[in-house]
């Protein structure tokens, strides 16, 4: 997994589901102390740990598996080619499963040309609804109404703004319109421990709105958050938008996604195509269609190198 919080959530889920079975589950990330990590690594090497969940920390030279049989890479779109190959080299011929809601163009192209198997899970969990997706220009009234509605049903809101300098200004704007709204700010330049505390506090419903950068996009599971507002949506890639939208709608409540962008007429052709695609493909299980659009817009990249998107200019290939 790409993030510490996501790794910890997976650890808790696995531990709960495998409770009572003779399978030890552990996790490795920067959140663990040196002593804890050392103990886990020792037990892993001796074969006492059946399932190890972790971030890029698993790539450390001190990580030794007794007999690695299966490698699962979650949120595959967040890893570069070299990192994924390094993961595969943990053991020769290890079975590998990569999972993502939106495969990056290079990975999707590998599957379409038959170099990798592709399985599509198009059936959502029971009692889930499509996320209502709307494109608006930046409007304080739209933002206020969206937050008020979510708070009226005791829900929570993600507000994504990728410019850290603007976050305090947006927080002041929300508190001016909704005085009783509890707003937290989170971004990647904060101390890891401070950021993780804010996210865990948000999970525990200590805040109504989490005003953050794209750090929230990687798989964090907060069923009580069912509205997401994405500012300057035209600046994000198609898979980024789909991943962020996927932070909501994880319960039996109707979820909403508001994409705030300048008028479509002022955007580039690619920017318009991205926003139109994310608005049109809002049904459950539509990630594969969005990935196909992304492949069409960005190109398949370099199948023999490290570029994971882009168009081949002078080199053809035959399948």
Model feature map: region roles:
Residues 7-11, 65-156:
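Post-DEXD/H (motif II) to motif III coupling segment of the RecA-like Helicase ATP-binding lobe
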